[in-house]
């Protein structure tokens, strides 16, 4: 008897249940699938995921506030990624897609109830969360609408900028996405949450940097804009306003002092070198945009050479 066909049908039924916000029904169907084919890896993986979420749903009753319930789903989505890393099984995209729809649909329902209050329609955090939810359910046009509203209040926020960049990339607005990602990783690289990113533009860059540098966590985030420049991802640049240029130079001065004074084994010390290099790159890009004296460009390049000769050779 060929068990592949019925199990495939059961998997699809389980995923449809998840997308319809019925995780309990999905569990029942997946258990049936495993009875039909005990060795089916996708069914086993999917059941682990569904059970993980059903366990988390028990705690939802602890929250009386609608907004807190929506926030709980988003926080658990990030914890779910940690669970996936720990499980270490092969990931099955149809399952992860269904789980994503389940999570963000549920969160969106709670946030929409809160958004109905006119006073909340200008709350930048709520607008960001609604945008994230629409992205999670695959409605990129509405995600763009809310994220563009959120960015009006959070122009220098790495998380909001990166979410807006990600949605633009998913909508094939490549040039806008490149500019926004570059901005996000300059303004606040530690604010970018790679677990919520979906576009191949940023996921591909993440994978390349992880493979080449063997990095993760905060250090990975600091190196990504540098390799974004090397790999030709962050290629859309802009001229800085005078006040921005002044702030950039002040930040460079502070970072140079941090790099010189902090022992390499001190906590967070590894973050300062790549952050300083990225600031140098922004200064060089500005000089090139305004056709500044080539001597100033070369002077800044030599500063990069002093702190990281390998990066210097790759960008020179």
Model-predicted segments: where are they?
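Short, charge-rich amphipathic alpha-helical segments embedded
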Residues: 23-59, 152-160, 307-314
């Amino acid at each position: 008897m060929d068990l592949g066909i019925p199990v495939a049908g059961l998997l699809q039924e389980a995923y449809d249940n998840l997308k319809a916000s019925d995780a309990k029904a999905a569990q029942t169907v997946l258990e049936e699938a495993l009875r039909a084919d005990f060795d089916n890896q996708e069914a086993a993986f999917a059941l682990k995921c569904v059970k993980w979420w059903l366990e988390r749903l028990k705690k939802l009753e602890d929250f009386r506030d609608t907004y807190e319930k929506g926030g709980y789903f988003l926080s658990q989505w990030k914890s779910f990624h940690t669970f996936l890393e720990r499980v270490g099984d092969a990931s099955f995209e149809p399952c992860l897609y269904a789980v994503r729809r389940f999570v963000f649909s549920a969160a969106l329902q709670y946030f929409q109830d809160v958004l109905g209050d006119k006073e909340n329609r200008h709350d930048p955090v709520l607008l960001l969360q609604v945008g994230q939810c629409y992205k999670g359910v695959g409605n990129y046009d509405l995600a763009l609408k809310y994220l563009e509203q959120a960015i009006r209040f959070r122009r220098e926020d790495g998380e909001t900028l990166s979410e807006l960049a990600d949605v633009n990339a998913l909508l094939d607005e490549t040039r806008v996405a490149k500019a926004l990602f570059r901005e996000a990783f300059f303004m606040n690289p530690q604010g970018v949450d790679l677990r919520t990113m979906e576009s191949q533009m940023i996921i591909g860059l993440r994978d390349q940097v992880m493979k080449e540098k063997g990095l993760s966590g905060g250090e990975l985030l600091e190196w990504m804009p540098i390799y974004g420049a090397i790999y030709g991802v962050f290629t859309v640049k802009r001229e800085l306003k005078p006040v921005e240029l002044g702030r950039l130079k002040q930040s460079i001065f502070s970072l140079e002092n941090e790099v010189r004074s902090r022992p390499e084994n001190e906590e967070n010390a590894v973050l300062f070198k790549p952050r300083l290099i990225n600031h140098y790159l922004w200064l060089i890009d500005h000089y090139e945009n305004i056709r500044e004296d080539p001597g100033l460009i070369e002077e800044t390049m030599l500063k990069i050479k002093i702190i990281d000769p390998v990066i210097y050779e790759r960008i020179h």
